[in-house]
């Protein structure tokens, strides 16, 4: 690999534009590919506009859009100009978006047509420049969503196409952007009370990408399919910056990745790399694979016997691998804990999965593995140039808070010195708030420090451990465990699709169905209590009829149900 002059996004892009000029950089699944040299030129075109409008080094520029090739062009245009990208998650509500724009002091916003209603009523003096990211058209002040299309076609101007001579002089010199300069501010929440703007530098992002490449190399022949939101650092660092650093191709879907959209796309792209969250594979396993393998009493009997279950998993896994295009060599899972039964299936089927661990504040990856070196229930080994310690570890179990120090750790929380101080120790270690164990170099996550329940005799009870047992039940999709009035409570969202399918044939009426579900919940409670320690036993179980509200990376927003 040709060495980077310095660890900045500008150096990354300039290097890749030369080394991989004629190769595909980004593309819609069914669209015309944008090559690396074209990507670089389009980045410069966007930069020229920003310079003409007075946007320069250090200015904040927001991005509010679904994933697309233009998202990456915009992100690199902002950061390689020396400005600061403020990516906003498309799931955020209007008031959350407004708060982020105000708090960050964003001078401009690149926004998709779909997201435009969120800023339609925002006072024009708050955001001076509004650009439609779909085609890089400038949106005039006072434009409404109703008039957006017609207004654009009549009165707006596209960003100027640069001449060859202009291209040479656009932007800053590489030396004008320092490794410690801020590249982006990522908001983990849009609400005023919980809003945290994570400040990441160019060095944070590039250093983390380089470290990940020591675990799992990416080459120019690799093909990525982008499924997770780009404003999340997991997708942005590992699904955008890292592949561009290595000359790989990134493909985007124009619609939500439902099975009818995703499966044909996977057959067309035949991706070699996918980055996902646990929920995706858990849904596939619980809704498709497990019901098929236990469809009748005979198959259930075979499935209950470990050797035949392993064989059935292997056969099902090979079919799944083929449905993913048949070329996958890295299926990365991060963002939350993976259900044990699903991981067992992936191991039995020799599916090329690997689990990683990280946070937005750490750019994100702290630990990871490649598919040949995974260990059951572990998130892999610590990145080679990062230091991790288990703080205040229990003398018996070795469990303690995971703390990190190194060049992947954020600079600060934006405009929030108090919170910044709270998450760093006096000797400079970042407090992740996660509990873990290190065994033979491998990291195992136990759960969130703030979620731990203290038992009557002082025992540490980890809700995530109990949840993993609950979630293995075939009729359960998701659950959360918490303490209420001194008792351990489980709130469970059942697999209603599977239950309805079973009872439709029996023509079960509503009264009988409610009775069945009540009995099922108690059966789940008894089954779980037989598998956990006495002090971890569930005293009360509650049906959660609606799906749990989740974050963009599909983590349950626990505070909505436990406070």
For every predicted segment, state its role.
Residues 64, 382, 396-397, 401-455, ...:
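Conserved ATP-binding/catalytic segment of the ANL
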Residues 250-253, 338-393, 397-400, 408-411, ...:
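Conserved ATP-binding loop and adjacent catalytic segment of the adenylate-forming AMP-binding
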Residues 206-223, 230-318, 327:
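Conserved AMP-binding/adenylation subdomain of ANL enzymes
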Residues 12-14, 80-160, 172, 486:
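Structural core segment of the AMP-binding/adenylate-forming
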Residues 35-37, 183-209:
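Conserved AMP-binding A3 loop
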Residues 14, 22-68, 72-76, 93-98, ...:
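Conserved AMP-binding/adenylate-forming core of the ANL superfamily
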Residues 21-22, 154-187, 194, 217-223:
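Conserved pre-ATP/AMP-binding loop-to-beta segment of ANL
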Residues 478, 486, 523-563:
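Conserved C-terminal "lid"/linker of ANL adenylate-forming enzymes
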